[in-house]
Structures are given as structure tokens and as C-alpha cells.
């Protein structure tokens, strides 16, 4: 029994097939079915998706379906020139793809496609022997060149003689010309003059007035041309056979290349599908959890994401709610996504989604839209359920839609409960939809089951398609009837016919729905506040980092200026000595030594004076020539440890000047306003086209503010936006480098860019 069809599996595969490059990939996609070990395929899809996000599309050349050409080679028939060209381009594409993955860091892709065999010699031979238009080149063989050279010489001789014949026999010709038919040069001779020249008549015009004659003097020449043409044909056949035999001798390698390219094309299509549907690669887990799962058959503008989690201590969901509320789509999505994951497909959902491997996936999907189900429909469903119950075990995922419907509600409910109990006893994991109140109550009291319902908006009389976990759904019949204007007297009459327990249950369900709606609203508010808090926290952390960076840059500048000054003074002294007009060289050297000794003595004296009399822990100081004020922490051996707020430096006391604490504010040239410019931008939610001007302006702002590094927050998702940002940065000559952030900077959700300043 094909349960995959009832879960829409084949329809989704058809969508994916549209992204394949050739029939090779489309055929491979048709072979993918759920398996208990989908790791291989999923890891390859994940690596190729990461490749796309970083490098864009891989180099693809001529990766077409050459299955027919391979079959022809196997049969022993030589390939035609255009077929050889097609195979050659395909094999050249294999080489390009193999080399591309060899130089990248994707181990699974590298390992898989390293098995592609190189046919470089064959490709070179084809390029030598066959022109791009499919004609056999003169370079194909020396013999072919000889034949064509002789044929060309002979043809020129015949044309020269033919021109002479036309000129000398113009009186017998119907027209001053000759024709080339069936490899022979013929002349249109007047029928009445056909005996004027010896030759062979080949054709007669429809009017009978003209005969096409081959003069005897041309017969031998024409025969020689025909012979050369036959030799040319045989030589070309030999060349084509020779090229085909190269492929035949490596048939196993050729077939393996075709299989590997079919697999690559299949992976390519799945990755394109993931990028188009904002999908992610979900790997087998020990639990079931859907995070913003989107059924791929529902148009993007109308799909409502499904969020659902089955706790480890539970083995089933009973989902209730009004018709057209999304129950069937919800359970179908669970089954479909499980089957797709087990077949190696990415899923249209968010990160955090988890799915289990089930060796058996079985489903009976009802017709939720049916107004009235007949006995035959009930029998049809029951036949499927009998098969499911018979085969179910602890390895089974069972999807049952509208269980117990289509018959008497009391009997249907009893039957549904009995079926659910049997499936749970066998260890199956179940997802069931129903309208029946006894089944809802049963689920509320069963330790292995969870109730869920589809949210309904009584104000608009329409479903929201959101799943509410932990509470059964109501029919909302009275609310809908009242809203549509049914007499209240009739509605009250209907209510009075409900049992006390039924009224209490409906009231309880309604109350739970209201409370859950409030909790969901609070949850959304808290989530929004948390996101705002995280943004604020990131902002302050960045402000702190920027302030610290600018402080360090300020001290670097001061130290550079100090060193420049020292070098300048030394240079001036050297020049003074060099241009001195009096005194000997030895005297000059002695004078320099004396100056340097005095300088050292002076500095030592300043150190001692500063250490003993001036600089002490707690003092506020500035570096010589500097503006930033710091506080002395300790003084040891002529060196002070100074705290400048965001930075501590060890500085010779001779380079420090005591100052007042207030001077820090008055004299410091350092000024930073974190609110004036931020070194990060958040482009999440934008398209690449929307983000491009924002990113370029951000680079402008960085350079105008003299800041070399910035952070672009694009989020993770499919990586399409990140890939687009990298392409923008790669083309911008102002950009020095860019990379993904470290874990502390935001990981692959952030790009760190450095610009020229």
C-alpha cells in the first residue's frame, strides 16, 4: 500500500525536480525513498547548501543526460560526431566539478565526487578531431588530410576544365553553366544537339528540351572524385570508431561518472529547493518537533507555519477542531516531513526542527471537506486502517485523519478509541484527527496522549490555522450560528439538549482556548521584549568595544608621536656633528658621548625625583605630550602602572606628568558618542536587492568616521542573504577583507567587514 502518495510525497518530489539541470537528476530524485539511514544524503545536501551560501553556484558545464550515448557505446555502435562532442563536454564538466570540490573544505562532497574519473585524453582527442560545428577536422588523421587535399586539387582541375567546356561548347548548351549532381559534373545540353559531343546522359528535363550530359573527358575525373569521397567516408568512420572505442574501453568509469553526475544534479535540485523555500537540513533525532514548518504545496503567501512538539514521554497527538481548520494539513506535514527527511530532502522549516526515523510510515488521510461520508467511504477507510493496525509496531509512525467518522458517532467514537489503544499498546507513534468528543476526553485522561486543537477566531468565524497544544478543540457550532444571525431562542433550545457534562466540557474547552490565547499573546510580547533586550545588549557591548578600541588607538598615536620626536632629535644631533667645522672627529665623538651621558643622568634624576617626590599610587597623571588622564596604581623601579579606564599601561615615570583629576574632562581630546554612529547594521528580513544600498552606505559611514571594522547582521536562515552580502563586499574596492563572525560575535549570522581608512 503506497502511503507516501496520501502524504503528498510524490507531488513535493515533482516540485524539486523542476530545479534539476537534466533528466539524470530528475530520474535520480524519483529513486529517493525513505530509508532508516539517510545521513549520507543529508550531509551531502547540507554541505552543498553551505557551498552555495559561501561560493554561489558551482561551475557547471555540459552536465546533460548522456544515457542514450552510453547505451549506444555499450551496443558497439560508433557515435556520431555530435554525440561524441556531447559526451566530451559532459566529461569536461565532470573534471571541472571534481577540481572545484577538491579545493574546497567540504569533506563529504570532496570524498563523493573524487570518484569522478578523468577522460582528459579523450576530450583532447575529440577537440582535435571534431570541430564545434560537428565536422571532422583535417587534423583528425594524416590520411584524411591527404584525401581531402587530393580531392580539393582534383575538384579545382575539374572546375577549370568545366569552365573551358562551357566556353568552347556554348552553341550546344541550353545555358552557359554546369551542375554538380550525385558527385558528377553535368552540362545542360540541348536535346537536339546531344550527339554533338560524346558522353553519358544522366537526366532529362521535364520538358524534354534539355539533357544533362557527362562528357567522356569528365567521366574518369568524376570517378576519381567519387573514389576519394568514398575513401574519406571510410576514414571518418574509422576515426569515429576509434574515438568510440576509447569510451568502450573505459565503460565502467563512464557509467560511474554518469551515476555521480545524476546524484550531483539531484543534490543540486534539492539545494535550489531549500533556498527557494527557505528550508533547512534536518537530521534524525530522538524526538518530533516542528518549528515554523511550512507545507510546500501551500502557496507562500497563504501558508501558516506549524509549531508542534511531542514530548519524550508522549507517543501521540489527538488533534481536534472545526472543518477546514488545518487539522489534515498538520498531520500530513508531520508524515510528509518525516518521509522527506528520511529520503534526504531539506525541509521548509526553521532551525530547531527535529524528526525521528520510522522504518514504517503509514497513513489514512480522510476527506476533510466532505459534507457527508457514505458507507462505502467508511468501508474504504476501514480497509486501510485494518492493514495499518495489522502491521503497526514500535517502529511505526501512524497518521489517521478523521478517525471514527463516516458512521454512527457513538459507534465511531468507541471504534476510534479501541484502535488508538491497540496502536499505543503496539508501541506506535500516532497523530490522529477527529471531531468526536469521547475521543477528546479519552486523550485528556491518557498518559501517553496529548490533545491539540486548531485555533478558531469566533469574531471572524474563521480558523487561524495555528496549532494549540494541550487543549482539545470545540465545534464552535453555537458561536457560528449566533454570529450568522440564527434566532437566540433556537440556539438556547439547542444548548438545553446538551447534557450537563457536555455543556461543562464545551465551557471548559472555550475557557482553555481563551487562556491559551492570552498566554500566546504574552509569550509573543516577551519574545519581542527579549529580542529588543538582546539588541540593546549587543549595542552596549559594541559601544564598549568601540570605546576600548578608540582608547588604544589614541595611546598608539601618542607613543608613535613620542618615538618620532626622539628620532627627529637624534637625526638633528647627527647632522650637527656631520657639518661641524671645528674640532677633530674624536673631539666630536667625545662631545656626543658627554651629551648622551648627561641626558641619561638627567632622565635618571627625573625618575628619582618623580618616584620619590612626585609620582605615587593614587596620583592622576598624563603621558608626556599626551592628553588622556590616568590614575597611578603602583610605582616600581622607575616604572608606573597607570589605569586609563579601559586600558592599563606600564610607563616610565619620566614620561609622566602629574595633573589634576578635573583635567581629564577639560583637556582630553577624546570624545565618543555611541549614539552618533553605530558600527553594526541589521538587515535581517531584507532581500539582497534591498540590502545592497544599505550595506554600501554603511561602508561609507565607516570610512567617514575613521572606523576600520563593522558588523553586518544578516541572520542564518538559508544563507541567501549572507551570500548576497558577500558578493556585494567582494565587488567593493573599499573593502579590505570580510569573514563570518566568531561565536562571540554572532557566528555565521554576522559578517565582519574591514574597510580602508
UniProtKB/Swiss-Prot annotation:
Show where the Smr domain sits: 681-756
Q: How is its activity regulated?
A: Nuclease activity is stimulated by interaction with MutL and inhibited in the presence of non-hydrolytic ATP (ADPnP). ATPase activity is stimulated by DNA.
Q: Where does ATP bind?
A: 321-328
Q: Give me any GO biological process, just one.
A: negative regulation of DNA recombination
Q: Does the keyword Heme apply?
A: no
Q: Which Pfam families match?
A: MSSS, MutS_V, Smr
**Record's PROSITE patterns?**
DNA_MISMATCH_REPAIR_2 (PS00486), SMR (PS50828)
- SMART domains per UniProt: MUTSac (SM00534), MUTSd (SM00533), SMR (SM00463)
What EC identifiers does the entry list? 3.1.-.-, 3.6.4.-
- Give the GO molecular function terms: ATP binding; ATP hydrolysis activity; ATP-dependent DNA damage sensor activity; double-stranded DNA binding; endonuclease activity; mismatched DNA binding; ribosomal large subunit binding; rRNA binding
UniProt entry keywords in alphabetical sequence = ATP-binding, DNA-binding, Endonuclease, Hydrolase, Nuclease, Nucleotide-binding, RNA-binding, rRNA-binding
Which family is this sequence assigned to?
A: Belongs to the DNA mismatch repair MutS family. MutS2 subfamily.
Listed under subunit, the entry gives: Homodimer. Binds to stalled ribosomes, contacting rRNA. Interacts with MutL.
Q: What does this protein do?
A: Endonuclease that is involved in the suppression of homologous recombination and thus may have a key role in the control of bacterial genetic diversity. Has ATPase activity. Binds to DNA.
- Protein name as it appears in the record: Endonuclease MutS2
Q: What is the organism field in this record? A: Thermotoga maritima (strain ATCC 43589 / DSM 3109 / JCM 10099 / NBRC 100826 / MSB8)
Its lineage opens with:
Bacteria, Thermotogati, Thermotogota, Thermotogae, Thermotogales
Question: Gene behind this chain?
Answer: mutS2
Amino acid at each position: 500500500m503506497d502511503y507516501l502518495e496520501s502524504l503528498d510525497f510524490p507531488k513535493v518530489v515533482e516540485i524539486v525536480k523542476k530545479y534539476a539541470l537534466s533528466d539524470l537528476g530528475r530520474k535520480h530524485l524519483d529513486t529517493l525513498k525513505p530509508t532508516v539511514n539517510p545521513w549520507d544524503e543529508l550531509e551531502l545536501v547540507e554541505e552543498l547548501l553551505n557551498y552555495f551560501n559561501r561560493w554561489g553556484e558551482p561551475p557547471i558545464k555540459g552536465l546533460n543526460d548522456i544515457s542514450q550515448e552510453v547505451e549506444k557505446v555499450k551496443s558497439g555502435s560508433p557515435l556520431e560526431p555530435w554525440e561524441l562532442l556531447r559526451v566530451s563536454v559532459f566529461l569536461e564538466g565532470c573534471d571541472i566539478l571534481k577540481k572545484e570540490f577538491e579545493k574546497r573544505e567540504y569533506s563529504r562532497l570532496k570524498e563523493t565526487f573524487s570518484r569522478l574519473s578523468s577522460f582528459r585524453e579523450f576530450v583532447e582527442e575529440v577537440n582535435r578531431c571534431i570541430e564545434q560545428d560537428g565536422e571532422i577536422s583535417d587534423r583528425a588523421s594524416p590520411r584524411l588530410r591527404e584525401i581531402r587535399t587530393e580531392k580539393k586539387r582534383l575538384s579545382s582541375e575539374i572546375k577549370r576544365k568545366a569552365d573551358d567546356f562551357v566556353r568552347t561548347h556554348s552553341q550546344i548548351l541550353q545555358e552557359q553553366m554546369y551542375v554538380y549532381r550525385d558527385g558528377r559534373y553535368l552540362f545542360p545540353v540541348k536535346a537536339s544537339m546531344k550527339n554533338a559531343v560524346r558522353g553519358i546522359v544522366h537526366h532529362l528535363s521535364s520538358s524534354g528540351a534539355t539533357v544533362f550530359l557527362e562528357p567522356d573527358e569528365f567521366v574518369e575525373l568524376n570517378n576519381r572524385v567519387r573514389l576519394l569521397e568514398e575513401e574519406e567516408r571510410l576514414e571518418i568512420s574509422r576515426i569515429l570508431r576509434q574515438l568510440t572505442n576509447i569510451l568502450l574501453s573505459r565503460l565502467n568509469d563512464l557509467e560511474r561518472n554518469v551515476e555521480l553526475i545524476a546524484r550531483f544534479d539531484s543534490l543540486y535540485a534539492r539545494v535550489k529547493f531549500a533556498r527557494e523555500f527557505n528550508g533547512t537540513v534536518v537530521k534524525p533525532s530522538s524526538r518530533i518537533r516542528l518549528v515554523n514548518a511550512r507545507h510546500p504545496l501551500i502557496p507562500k503567501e497563504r501558508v501558516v507555519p506549524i509549531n508542534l512538539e511531542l514530548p519524550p514521554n508522549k507517543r501521540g497527538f489527538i488533534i481536534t477542531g472545526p472543518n477546514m481548520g488545518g487539522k489534515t494539513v498538520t498531520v500530513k506535514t508531520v508524515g510528509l516531513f518525516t518521509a522527506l527527511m528520511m529520503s534526504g530532502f531539506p525541509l521548509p522549516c526553521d532551525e530547531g526542527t527535529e524528526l525521528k526515523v520510522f522504518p514504517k510510515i503509514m497513513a489514512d488521510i480522510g476527506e476533510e471537506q466532505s459534507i457527508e461520508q457514505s458507507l462505502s467511504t467508511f468501508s474504504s477507510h476501514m480497509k486501510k486502517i485494518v492493514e495499518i493496525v495489522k502491521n503497526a509496531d514500535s517502529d511505526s509512525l501512524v497518521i489517521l485523519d478523521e478517525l471514527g467518522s463516516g458512521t454512527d458517532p457513538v459507534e465511531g467514537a468507541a471504534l476510534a478509541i479501541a484502535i488508538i489503544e491497540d496502536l499505543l499498546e503496539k508501541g506506535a507513534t500516532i497523530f490522529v484527527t477527529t471531531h468526536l468528543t469521547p475521543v477528546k476526553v479519552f486523550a485528556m485522561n491518557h498518559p501517553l496522549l496529548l490533545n491539540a486543537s486548531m485555533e478558531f477566531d469566533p469574531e471572524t468565524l474563521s480558523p487561524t490555522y495555528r496549532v494549540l497544544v494541550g487543549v482539545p478543540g470545540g465545534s464552535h457550532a453555537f458561536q457560528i450560528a449566533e454570529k450568522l444571525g440564527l434566532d437566540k431562542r433556537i440556539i438556547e433550545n439547542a444548548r438545553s439538549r446538551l447534557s450537563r457534562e457536555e455543556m461543562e466540557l464545551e465551557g471548559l474547552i472555550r475557557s482553555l482556548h481563551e487562556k491559551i490565547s492570552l498566554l500566546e499573546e504574552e509569550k509573543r510580547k516577551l519574545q519581542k521584549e527579549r529580542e529588543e533586550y538582546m539588541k540593546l545588549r549587543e549595542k552596549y557591548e559594541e559601544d564598549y568595544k568601540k570605546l576600548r578600541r578608540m582608547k588604544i588607538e589614541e595611546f598608539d598615536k601618542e607613543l608613535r608621536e613620542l618615538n618620532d620626536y626622539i628620532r627627529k632629535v637624534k637625526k638633528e644631533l647627527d647632522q650637527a656633528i656631520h657639518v661641524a667645522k671645528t674640532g677633530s672627529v674624536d673631539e666630536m665623538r667625545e662631545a656626543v658621548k658627554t651629551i648622551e651621558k648627561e641626558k641619561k643622568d638627567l632622565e635618571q634624576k627625573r625618575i628619582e625625583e618623580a618616584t620619590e617626590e612626585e609620582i605615587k599610587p593614587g596620583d592622576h597623571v598624563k603621558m608626556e605630550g599626551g592628553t588622556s588622564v590616568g590614575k597611578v596604581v603602583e610605582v616600581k623601579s622607575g616604572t608606573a602602572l597607570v589605569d586609563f579606564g579601559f586600558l592599563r599601561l606600564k610607563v616610565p615615570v619620566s614620561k609622566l606628568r602629574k595633573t589634576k583629576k578635573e583635567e581629564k574632562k577639560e583637556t582630553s581630546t577624546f570624545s565618543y558618542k555611541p549614539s552618533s554612529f553605530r558600527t553594526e547594521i541589521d538587515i535581517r528580513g531584507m532581500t539582497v536587492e534591498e540590502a545592497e544600498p544599505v550595506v554600501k552606505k554603511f561602508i561609507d559611514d565607516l570610512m567617514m568616521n575613521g572606523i576600520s571594522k563593522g558588523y553586518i547582521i544578516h541572520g542564518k536562515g538559508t544563507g541567501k542573504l549572507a551570500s548576497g552580502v558577500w558578493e556585494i563586499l567582494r565587488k567593493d574596492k573599499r573593502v579590505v577583507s570580510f569573514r563570518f563572525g566568531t561565536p562571540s560575535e554572532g557566528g555565521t549570522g554576522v559578517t565582519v567587514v574591514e574597510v580602508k581608512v
